[in-house]
Amino acid sequence: NCQSNDDGTLSDEEFKWLTMRAEGGFGLTMTCAAHVQAVGRGFPGQLGIFGDNQLDGLTRLASAIKSHDSIAVAQLHHAGMRSPHDLIEGPPVSASDDEETGSRALSTDEVKQVITDFISAAIRAERAGFDGVELHGAHGYLICQFLSSEINHRTDEYGGTLDNRARVLTEIIDGIRDNCASEFLLGVRLSPERFGMDL
C-alpha cells in the first residue's frame, strides 16, 4: 500500500513489493486495494484500476506474478465515505448522506455508474492478464456501507431490505460473470469487523 504513483499507475516500488511475494513461493498473490473510481481513492499512493492509462503497469504486474507460478488476483476497492476529503478534492460519497464524515449520498444514476466501474475494472484486470479479482466488501468501505442498515437509508432499489442493500454487490457480481470468462476467478471479501456499523 501507499507505494504507487499519484495517478494510480503502478510504481516500481509496488511492483517489486508484490512480485517478491510471488517469487517467494506464494501460491496466490493479490494486489493491495485498487480503486475503481478516482473519487473512491482511500489513501495516498493507492494503486488504481479505473483507467486504461493504468493498464500497462497492471499487465506488467500480472505477467511477473504468473511467471513465478503464482495465481494473480486484483483486489477491487472503493473507499466511499472513508475517502479523505483532501485526497479526492471534494466530499466523499456513500450510500446516504453522513454528517459526521461530510459524505454525500450517491444518486441512483451514480450508484449504477459505481457498479459499471467495478465491472469495468474486472474486465480491465482480465485484459491485463490477472486470473481473477476480489471485491473488497469489508472494513467499512463502500460495498460495506451499502450493506449497513445504519448507514444506508436509501428509499430506492439500493436501500431498505437486506436484498436491496446487497443489490450493489450482487449486480457487480452478475456483471462480472456476464462480461468475463467463466474460468475468471471472483471472490468477495467480507469481514466480521463492522467499524461501528449494524449490518
Residue ranges and their predicted role:
Residues 48-59, 84-98, 187-199:
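Short, electropositive alpha-helical surface patch
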Residues 46-73, 148-187:
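Alpha-helix-loop-beta-strand connector modules within alpha/beta enzyme cores
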Residues 36, 49, 84-106, 145-163:
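Aromatic- and acidic-residue-enriched carbohydrate-binding clefts of CAZyme catalytic domains
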Residues 1-77, 114, 122:
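N-terminal capping/small domains of soluble enzymes
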Residues 63, 71, 77-130:
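Non-globular sequence segments
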Residues 8-9, 115-119, 124-126, 158-171, ...:
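Active-site glycine- and acidic-residue-rich loops that bind
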